[in-house]
Amino acid sequence: MRVAKWLTGLLCPISLLLTGSWEVRFHPRQEALVKTLASYEVVTPTRVNEFGDVFPQNRHFSRKKRSSGVPEPPPFRTHYRISAYGQLFQLNLSADAAFLAAGYTEVHLGTPVPGPGGRSTESPDLRHCFYRGQVNAREDHTAVFSLCGGLMGTFKANDGEYFLEPVLRADGSAHDDDHNKPHLIYRQELKRNSFARSHKPCEVSENQMEKTALPSQSSRNTTGDVDIEEEAVFRLEGERSQLHSRNKRFLSYPRYVEVMVTADAKMVHHHGQNLQHYVLTLMSIVAAIYKDSSIGNLINIVIVKLVVIHSEQEGPVISFNAATTLRNFCLWQQSQNVPDDAHPSHHDTAVLITREDICGAKEKCDTLGLAELGTLCDPSRSCSISEENGLSAAFTIAHELGHVFNVPHDDSFKCKEAGIKHQYHVMAPTLNYHTSPWTWSACSQKHITEFLDTGHGECLLDKPNGRTYDLSPQLPGSVYDGNRQCELMFGPGSQVCPYLKHCRRLWCTSAEGVHKGCRTQHMPLADGTSCGPGMHCHRGLCVTRDMETRPVDGEWGPWGPYSSCSRTCGGGIKSTARLCDRPEPRNGGRYCVGRRMKFRSCNTDSCPKGKRDFREKQCSDFDGKHFDINGLPPNVRWLPKYSGIAVKDRCKLYCRVAGTTSFYQLKDRVADGTPCGTETNDICVQGLCRQAGCDHVLNSKAKRDKCGVCGGDNSSCQTLAGVFNSAHYGYNVVVKIPAGATNIEILQHSYSGRPEDDNYLALSDTQGNFLLNGNFVVSMAKKEINIQGAVFEYSGSNNSIERINSTDRLEAELVLQVLCVGNLYNPDVRYSFNIPIEERSNLFSWDPYGPWQDCTKMCQGLHRRKIACVRKSDHAVVSDHNCGHLPMPLFVTEKCNMDCELRWHIIGKSDCSSQCGQGYRTLDVHCMKYSVHKGQAVPVGDQYCGDQLKPPSREPCHGSCVLTRWHYSEWSQCSRSCGGGDKTRESYCVNGFGHRLAESECRELPRVVLENCNEFPCPSWATSEWSECPVTCGKGMKQRQVWCQLSEDPMRDGFCNASTKPESLRPCELRACASWHVGPWGSCTATCGHGYQMRAVKCISEIFGTMLDDRECPQASRPSDRQDCILAPCLAIPEVGATSLPAIPLGRAAQWRHGSWTPCSVSCGRGSQARYVSCRDAHDEVADESNCAHLPRPAAVSLCFSPCGEWQAGDWSPCSASCGHGKTTRRVLCVNYHQLVDESYCDPEGRPVTEQECSLAACPPLYSRAPSSSEQPSHVPSRNVPLTHKPGENQDQGAQLSIRGNQWRTGPWGACSRSCAGGLQHRAVVCQDEDGRSATSCDGSSKPPESRHCGSGPCPHWNYGDWGECTQTCGGGVKSRFVICQFPNGQMTQEHSCELPKPPSMMQCHLHACPEDVSWYRGPWKSCSASCGKGVKYREVLCIDQFQRKLEEKYCSHLHKPRTHKACRSGRCPSWKANKWKECSVTCGSGVQQREVYCRLRGTGRVSEDMCDPSTRPQGQRQCWRQDCMRYQWTTGDWLDCSTSCKKKETYRLVKCVNEQNVQANESLCDPLTKPLSIKKCRNPHCKYSVVTGDSSQCAGNCGFTSPQKITYCTKIQSSKKHTFHQLRPVVYGECPVIPSPQAYKCDLRSCLHVATWKVGKWSKCSVTCGIGIMERRVACRTENGWPSDLCLKRLKPDAQKKCYANDCKLLTTCKELQVTNNVTKDGDYDLNVRGRILKIHCSGMQLENPREYLPLVKSEDNFSEIYGLRLQNPYECPFNGSRRPDCACENDYLPAGYTVFSKVRVDLESMQIKTADLLFSQTLSGKAVPFATAGDCYSAARCPQGQFSINLAGTGMKISNTAKWLAQGRYASVIIHRSQDGTKVYGRCGGFCGKCIPHMATGLSIQVL
């Protein structure tokens, strides 16, 4: 053991030295981390651009945590390069902050207290930090990093996952040098404890445990709950909770739990800067738990706020006492909440995470969390607390949140009661080895579902917006490794137990070491924690990382069968449910949304009379059960409790103890179908009160009418009412109420208006047995009486109005009586009830002409009119039971939907299964709806064609056996979803074996790569007419219907564009509203005791404030104008004598009341109006007028005036004086509609004045003589009077000399008295002397004129047309006419130019009342007038009465007449369709080009050409011209020599077709009739033979000779023109024509030859697995003894090879197809069909979902890329003529320099491009890795490139495409490219200062098959 420890201690420093990290001093946290690692490295990441160029040093880590100021915008993409573990990692990253919401904020309370990693209160903006991308261009190698302050994150590579984080200084600060910042990198799967294998398991003592024990020990509680009412079976009446609003139930809605998470000060001190990240990691686990499918609901955990408490004084008081802490936190979180549920910061529940060691009780600190049951959506109680002890705290938070959802523990009584036992999941009371904390038990699912379905989760329905943020998608174990989880749970220094390593439980050592034992809190390791190479923990199991983790959304399974009926009568319920299991949601996928349960009514017939109440039966099931309640007898009997139960608790089973008022809740819910109460028809379903009708049907609205008939129409009964007011002592019979009576209402008004009364109601049966208030005993309290099933409510006698009422049907006759006692005041009994009508046969009848019902079929169907029962008196539709005794007439039927047909249509056919010979094809058959007039077809459900025989979906076919054919890919998606689009597919030419050929081989075959699709019209919005304004005055909103339709068929709104939806609401405004206004109350009419007071109530216009007639205001809301008043009691009047006057009863004071005035008695002029005036007593009853004599009687008649005309006033005339004061006048006329009438027809009080005074300038003084110089004038002339005139003025304006210097003076002309037709102008003319004084001696003959004519042209006048038609024929309409002001010549002018008042342009008409019950009948729309395109459709609109009889249209003219025609569109018209032109008919010269032209109807396809316009038919043929034809001829070669063999029979020569340039061409271009012979017979001499005797030898033993003999051979003499030689081998003697000499027969040679024979082996397997190959076998010449021999006859030698044919080749074109089809999972080289040629392709990643293809390179040394590293000191020269020289004046400091060779390159076989950035099969020999086909340098700016790349694809079957180009990048970049002739080799030299070349991004590095 000690040796092992010593070795371990020695190996760790050695490993650190090897990694070179001793140079770095780590922060203590990182120091502890590296001690647990098997290896790590310290590296410096380099930021590069997408081409690999290094960024300047100040641009490497530019991202900072933002606070204030204007930040630098982050790049969307960035690239980094890391060299570690002998590999080069290229990180291609893109910004990705999707997991953070736009409004994410933190709330910090208190001043931060520095601690371990203390932080500032300023929350950094983290959005710009986060990036996500790939490593080395591998899509499956993901990388997730934060770039703030360095690179922190993880990435995946071939050998596992790597973690990277900046190295912190020992004091915790970061390195300042951003561009040269050291980073720590380590692999996840290599993390080990350095002593993990040095110890064996040891025992763990109990005294070492803190909160947990080994599984063998007894576990203790880890979650404590305030389980109020959890174990209770019943509760008392006082227990109530708030009623929630109802919504649709039994539907799976998405729920959003908005959570406020609070971290206390201890959390801040412990986690420091990592707090936010850590808390979000915990909540991500919680969110994943609540997304598990086992919860049975779609619940989203959403964090809306994170509150960080730095100072304990700023937050709730947190102590060791769990209950107190929970109470304090609940109070505090309510103050942090926003009440508005729609506010972004509102939270539904609050979670406190604390590191305080909370305790459930004294000395019992094993509690990890606390919450109260069922408090979700309660603002003051929806909260929970959880103790943080590592990542396992997430399970505690989820557990406590489950309690908030009202979920009990998995071992609670409620779970056992439901029959669910031994399931321990999230809600397990304790955590042990058998607990599964990720999933939910069936009990938990049941309670969460019930909690939500019963309306307690309504606050979760709003989807949060704004300040919410997503949780991190990273698995928590990938961020916090196992050792870190131990530290979070048990403190620093704790490590994963080395001998208890499994995912199900996290076992940890103590800080002192493993020798102190291991401990656990029964929590599993976090998901994502490494558990082995390529493995990680997932829900307690160690699984491979490649396990499918994509989210899978759940889908509903089928509905199950309906359950049995819950009741045998009275309306039961059947239910069915479905599960979310097709598939079940996995890996965080969404739970199903929609209805999970359906219900239907059953056994709806009413129960027979006398059957026990259903709720009573359920209570009686508990008879004899007392539940250990004190005071209950053993044989207790339970009765239903109806009254006094809260509305929300009506569906719980409350029962009371018989004989007492005590009641208890015995069950959480009553049986389905139980009525919610006695006063309603609603029934309970699954604990909820659901609507039902009196017919006991769920969701029915049927109600009983006043006759007690369910669904009745009040026509089967009549109402009887009466009054009884006579009194005799004792019981007085009021009325007998017969059996069958319903709606019984009995009132007895107290004579004094007080409850104290001596008259009381009573009920008895016909035998005199009292049922209420009998035997002079009266019930004062309210009560209910059940009389043979009819429930009567009695108000009790202690009411001023005593009341008995019942709505039920009375089954037996009752006698209503009134008991009179005491002073025998007359009773005031008022009663009413309904009794059935006995004789109804002649009251009702069947009407067969009801509304049309739905058509029986979508097309070619029938519909019929509904037969309704109507009342004969008014033809009103009544319930059918009223006509039940009458025979029903025959239905009126009519054909419907005749404009369409339903037919099976073959939409498409597959290709024939056999390419040659008999096969079959599948047919795509659908039901289509064909429009007869529109000419279009729409697919419908197949069920609509169910009455027709469906064509078979398979038909025989025959392959064309063509040698070539077009092979197609799948069709693409249609370019448009409606309105006609196109879809395309790819095609290529193949032969019969599926091998790809040149397209020219198939050019004669039709090629279909484009097809029309989705040619049906798009849905569009349709609108109805605007409704009338819904208000009678003021402002309102009128509306219209807006719907989405397709060819007039309604569709869901989602099918139409929401942005173009027309408005459905529009404001409207009518005349101003009138409202009641009240004045102050007057004085009381009494001075003591009771009286009343009055006030004024007026109807006032809201806008003008004028008083209106009372009829303009709503009478129902008229305020009272009278109220009682009570003053001090009156003094008692002492008695005088034995008798006194009877006292006036209090409240008997009378007053005058009056109604509103009637309309005036005349329509115009003076008349009279009247009103009703009456004397009313205190009860508002009519009293004798003598009782009101003390008050003045209001007038009952008044004079009134209704003006017949109106006053019209003209313009004022000019002032009568030219100066000073005068008068002006105008005309005032009484006009009625432009006609002058007598002034008596106008209101004299409103007559305008006709005369008024006018004032002008003061007049000048007049003098009778000239004053002397000594006299002073008595008046100074006004300044306004001119004293002098300028000479030369005309007569009008100048002065005229007169006698002695006097002259006339004139003033300015006044305004013209008229603007037209001879008006007058006036001016002042005065005589003045030289001094300007008034004189009288001016020459009268020369006096200027005082007036003159003015105004030119005639005056305009009013012109008007005839009155138009009245808008209504009755009920008051309006007619109008055109009124204009114009001159006699017809010229129009402004209206004010006409002097007379404007005649009215509108007036009322047809004021008589309209006839009732008429309406417009709208007939069905006729067919469209056009068979295609736009047209018009018409319908019949008739005026009919209530009996459907046709009337003249004038009777309906007051109603808006519906339109009789509208535009229509009958689908698209057929049109010509022209395909593309085919190839020219000749290859040279003049030919013909054709194309297919046909008539097409969209949606149907080809139709007859007669349907299209022949004049517009496109041309189907045209001439074409190719290049001039070449002349071809046959040419021959020389014949082969026949003399080479005496046996040769034929000779050959070469015959070929050549063009004019003697270039060989295809033989089809030459005339086959003139082709020369290529074969002819040889004429050779016969072969010559000779006999040759060989040396002596022994014959074979079996040849018959035993002595040596000379062997004689027969040989053939070969002769040619130059040589004669012998054949080397003998021939058979039978063929030899030469007879040998006798001595030659020494051996029996013929016998020897026959002994040697050919021997053959077995055929080998075919050389190919598919297609045509070769089979081989061994053939050898052997003797009988098996010896090899040369004596076998060659012509008899069997074949050693032959052709073979394997199965048809399935052309595998990608590694993915190879993986799926042949189930290949091993990486390696495989033969794939690449564009018709079989090539060797390397498949990599065959065990992954998407393997990749690589092209093996024959010579890797010829495939390299280089970035040259030397740089000239003088960059503006090119030394050595551009050659490389090591002795150049250069510096070797170019950082991107590198040299990479490639053994394989990745190819995209679909786009035929090489992925140059893939470096998987590359080796970097020096420097940095360089992508394929890339070169560059920083050598020179003088076009002297030194960087080079080489491509050699020889032997691969591919070449570089001619379209491949290289792009120069950088400064002074130059590119030199050399290609081989066959395209297999490319060499390039690139460079600049600094520059490089890469394949052009637009084309990529394209390749082609040779």
From Swiss-Prot:
It comes from the Eukaryota. Residues 255-464 form the Peptidase M12B domain. Pfam families: ADAMTS_CR_2, ADAMTS_CR_3, ADAMTS_spacer1, GON, Pep_M12B_propep, Reprolysin, TSP1_ADAMTS, TSP_1. One of its GO terms (molecular function) is zinc ion binding. Residues 27-249 form a propeptide. May play a role in tissue-remodeling process occurring in both normal and pathological conditions. May have a protease-independent function in the transport from the endoplasmic reticulum to the Golgi apparatus of secretory cargos, mediated by the GON domain. This is A disintegrin and metalloproteinase with thrombospondin motifs 20. It comes from Mus musculus.
